[in-house]
Amino acid sequence: VQAARVLWRQAQPQWDSQRLVFIDETGLNTKMARLYGRSPTHQRCVASVPHGHWQSSTFIAALRAESIAAPFLIKGAVNAEVFTAYLAQVLCPELRRGDVVVLDNLSTHKIASVTALITARGATVRYLPPYSPDLNPIELAFAKLKAHLRQAAARTLLDLQGALADSLASFQPAHCQGFFRHARYASI
């Protein structure tokens, strides 16, 4: 694993950040609440947090150096069939010839149809080294996204969709470039 990470780091300066497209998924639910709060001195910070039933969904997106692209929200978990449909219907129409699509090592990312769909658009596929979220700038984007969603405290899937749309609209090109720089894709 360490050798793969070293090889990845050595190759990073050679890649054009404008051509990199990082894809990942993250879980969202209707019980998301802020993890920290503030209150006046000597007063307890109190907030309500839902317990019991909640609804879960999965958000898939691509991160480019200038924006979050191809957002997709699905109720429940992602499997190979869902991921393949996402690629065919949402991501591939946005890919440009010469793009480099970077995926983590999730088993649903490694099926033959994934590579076939991406290469058919003139793009190439690269897989991150195992256990390397620090090399994936979309992880930083998801952290910012989830902070917004916790603050919004959406308690229904419809409210969650609205909060997600608001959060995605708040991402500026400078934010995306910062995520790339933090992960050392610095030709921006």
Protein language model features and the residues they cover:
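Short functional hotspots at interaction and active-site rims
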Residues: 1-188
